[in-house]
């Protein structure tokens, strides 16, 4: 059982009374329709969504993962322990896309024992975060649907299941290649990858229906396996409810060597990203 989950269960069972801390639960954010798993108890403000809660939005949504017993996290990596009622956490800390791990621990008393806590936050990480925010504004991505609009069935498992067109505005001349990632952050078991491609030649338009082959000639790119276990694009096919599907474009300063999963691809481009842009669409299946 995860560290925070374990603390949460102890609290639910009546142990450690008087302590306030971040607990894990499942609730729906009315703002971005995300099923979030973070709840900040006590004076630190109640429920806070990973999209920013009261002030954030889908374009700022970042992922949180379950914490294991060592306190380590997956990518996006913000871990916040807020066990002391005298401490407050900010409603929103945005580390999305820099794939850095920042673990913030606060001092507390749990079941009569003091938990020593440390803040691990290198200045370079925060500098990278600021740079990332600026970079995120530099590309405009458009498609066959409006940002936040419904994805046409043509591009889903209920239709032709072909990739939608992507129009990219604002590319710099020194960009060497593009990376494409399409993912569903609302999947029941965590982020689900629908498409990854790298070494995409810099272009202002990626036409629809990219062939489902590893190597593509027009435009030139290399495609990896998605979470369906297939090469290339496979579209939205949510088991229930309305899901969000992000099409993320990274403009980088190099060509990549190797074969990658989504996580490996994100690690490979770290430190090489010149520009970034995204568009997301919504899709739910008729029952």
From Swiss-Prot:
CDD domains: PEBP_bact_arch. Pfam families: PBP. SUPFAM superfamilies: PEBP-like (SSF49777). InterPro entries: PEBP (IPR008914), PEBP-like_sf (IPR036610), YbhB_YbcL/LppC-like (IPR005247). It comes from the Archaea. Disulfide bonds: none annotated. Belongs to the UPF0098 family. This is UPF0098 protein AF_1698. It comes from Archaeoglobus fulgidus (strain ATCC 49558 / DSM 4304 / JCM 9628 / NBRC 100126 / VC-16).
């Amino acid at each position: 059982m995860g560290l925070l989950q374990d603390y949460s269960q102890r609290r639910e069972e009546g142990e450690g009374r008087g302590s306030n801390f971040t607990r894990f639960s499942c609730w729906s954010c009315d703002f971005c329709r995300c099923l979030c798993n973070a709840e900040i108890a006590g004076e630190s403000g109640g429920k806070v969504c990973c999209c920013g809660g009261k002030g954030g939005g889908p374009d700022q949504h970042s992922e949180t993962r379950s914490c294991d017993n060592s306190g380590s996290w997956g990518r996006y990596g913000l871990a916040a322990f807020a066990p002391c009622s005298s401490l407050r956490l900010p409603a929103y800390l945005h580390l999305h896309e820099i794939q850095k791990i920042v673990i913030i621990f606060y001092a507390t008393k749990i079941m009569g024992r003091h938990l020593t806590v440390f803040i691990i936050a290198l200045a370079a990480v925060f500098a990278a975060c600021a740079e990332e925010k600026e970079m995120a504004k530099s590309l405009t991505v458009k498609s066959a649907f409006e940002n936040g609009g419904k994805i046409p069935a043509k591009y889903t498992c209920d239709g032709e299941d072909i990739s939608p067109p992507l129009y990219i505005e604002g590319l710099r001349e020194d960009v060497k290649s593009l990376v494409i990632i399409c993912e569903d952050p609302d999947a029941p078991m965590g982020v689900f990858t629908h498409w990854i491609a790298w070494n995409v030649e810099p272009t202002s338009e990626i036409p629809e229906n990219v062939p489902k082959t590893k190597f593509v000639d027009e435009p030139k790119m290399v495609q990896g396996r998605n979470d369906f276990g297939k090469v290339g694009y496979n579209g939205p096919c949510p088991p229930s409810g309305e899901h969000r599907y992000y099409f993320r474009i990274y403009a980088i300063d190099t060509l990549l060597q190797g074969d990658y999963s989504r996580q490996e691809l994100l690690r490979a481009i770290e430190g090489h990203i010149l520009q970034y842009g995204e568009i997301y669409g919504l899709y739910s299946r008729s029952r």
